[in-house]
Structures are given as structure tokens and as C-alpha cells.
Amino acid sequence: MVLLTMIARVADGLPLAASMQEDEQSGRDLQQYQSQAKQLFRKLNEQSPTRCTLGAGAMTFHYIIEQGVCYLVLCEAAFPKKLAFAYLEDLHSEFDEQHGKKVPTVSRPYSFIEFDTFIQKTKKLYIDSRARRNLGSINTELQDVQRIMVANIEEVLQRGEALSALDSKANNLSSLSKKYRQDAKYLNMRSTYAKLAAVAVFFIMLIVYVRFWWL
């Protein structure tokens, strides 16, 4: 289930729009997550990963960054990641069309709170079980969600690091993995060439032997 949706400007973390689950009990529980989301917005910058998943206990944050705007959603951990990112992409398309040009000029928090109407409508579409099945089939072209950076929200907030630092570590690991694969490929090629050379030497020696001893 989609429980909390927030949109913020990356440059300064200014909240632009938000929508929270209307259920009273969930509303009380979600205050902590809303606070975490605001802290997260303040840590974002131009070098932050543009797609990220952050574990938060029984809940999960997902966000995307497009044109300097962060679109974030809080879901139950069991909610499909693919649908969560498809939901965020839908919000981005509509929000950018309606308010994209005005984003750099606003200074008041929640200047586009009226966007909640579209958020609520889209959220219902993704929560409905039948609609979710349909969305699952039409979004097969969505980017590979397995490649999206994954972290823990508490660790990110407590460590005090900008998300760009985490992104750098992820990139470093990716580079090391790529180098390992390249080195392994190089060693395999050398091994193959060595075997071929040994076979070639054997046949050359055989030819020389036959020529000098049998002819």
C-alpha cells in the first residue's frame, strides 16, 4: 500500500506537495516517516543517486529525482518496487507538466498542495488489485529495478553523509566489480593462448621429427 507521498525541491529540500494516508491510526504512525522524509530531502544534492530505495523497518521509501525535483513515496515493504517506481514516474510526468516551470521561483512550503488531488487519484489506481495487475503488464519496459541503489534510512540519516557519498561508494563497488570481470577475462584469454601455443609447438616438433627421421 502507498502510505505517504512527498515532492520536494532538491536544491534546498523545500517541500512542494504531499499526500498522507487518511486513516487516523496510520496518520499517527506516519508522522515519524514524514519527519524522516524531510530530513532526507535536506541531504539530497545534484550528485545524489536519481533512483533509490531506503528500508525503514516494515516500510520502504522509494524516490526518483527529475529536473531538480525529488518524488518520494513510502510503501509497505511488500509493495512491489516496480509499481512504486512506475507510480513515481507518473507523478513526475504530471507534476512537471503542471508546475515544472514554477518550481525554481516558489519560496513557500507546499506551494503546490493542490497537486494532492492528482496524487490521490493515482494512488487509488496503484492500490487497486486489478489495476495493479494491469500496470504490472504494461510497465515491463520500466528500467531494471534491481539496479536501483538500496540503503537503510536510519543509517543514512544517522551517519550524516550526503547521499552523494553513498552513491560514490556504490559506483566504486561497481568499478571494482567491472575491473574484476575484465581481469578475469584477460586471464582466461591468456590461458587459452597458452594452451594454443603448446598445441602449436607440439605439432611443429612432430613435423620436424617426421621430416628429419623418416624422410
From Swiss-Prot:
Longin domain span: 6-119
UniProt keywords (A-Z) are:
Acetylation, Coiled coil, Endoplasmic reticulum, ER-Golgi transport, Golgi apparatus, Membrane, Phosphoprotein, Protein transport, Transmembrane, Transmembrane helix, Transport
State any GO BP term from the record: retrograde vesicle-mediated transport, Golgi to endoplasmic reticulum
Gene Ontology MF annotations: SNAP receptor activity
- Which residues belong to any copy of the v-SNARE coiled-coil homology domain? 134-194
What are the GO cellular component annotations?
endoplasmic reticulum membrane; endoplasmic reticulum-Golgi intermediate compartment membrane; Golgi apparatus; melanosome
Q: Phosphoserine is carried by which residues?
A: 137, 164, 168, 174, 177
**Membrane topology of this protein:** Single-pass type IV membrane protein
The subcellular localization recorded is: Endoplasmic reticulum membrane; Endoplasmic reticulum-Golgi intermediate compartment membrane; Golgi apparatus, cis-Golgi network membrane; Golgi apparatus, trans-Golgi network membrane
Q: Name one Pfam family in it.
A: Synaptobrevin
Could you list the residue ranges that cross the membrane? 195-215
Which ranges of this chain reside in the Cytoplasmic compartment per its record? 1-194
Supply the InterPro entries for this chain: Longin-like_dom_sf, Longin_dom, Sec22, Synaptobrevin-like, V_SNARE_CC
Q: What residues bear Phosphothreonine in this entry?
A: 140
**Gene3D superfamilies per UniProt:** 1.20.5.110, Longin domain
Which SUPFAM superfamilies does the protein's record reference? SNARE fusion complex (SSF58038), SNARE-like (SSF64356)
Residues bearing PTM N6-acetyllysine:
38
Role noted for this protein? SNARE involved in targeting and fusion of ER-derived transport vesicles with the Golgi complex as well as Golgi-derived retrograde transport vesicles with the ER.
Query: What subunit structure does UniProt give?
Result: Interacts with STX17. Component of two distinct SNARE complexes consisting of STX5, GOSR2/BOS1, BET1 and SEC22B or STX18, USE1L, BNIP1/SEC20L and SEC22B. YKT6 can probably replace SEC22B as subunit of either complex. Interacts with the COPII Sec23/24 complex composed of SEC23A and SEC24A; recruits SEC22B into COPII-coated vesicles to allow its transport from the endoplasmic reticulum to the Golgi. Interacts with BET1.
Q: What does the similarity note say?
A: Belongs to the synaptobrevin family.
Name used for this protein in its record: Vesicle-trafficking protein SEC22b
Source species, please?
A: Cricetulus griseus
Q: What is the lineage of its organism?
A: Eukaryota, Metazoa, Chordata, Craniata, Vertebrata
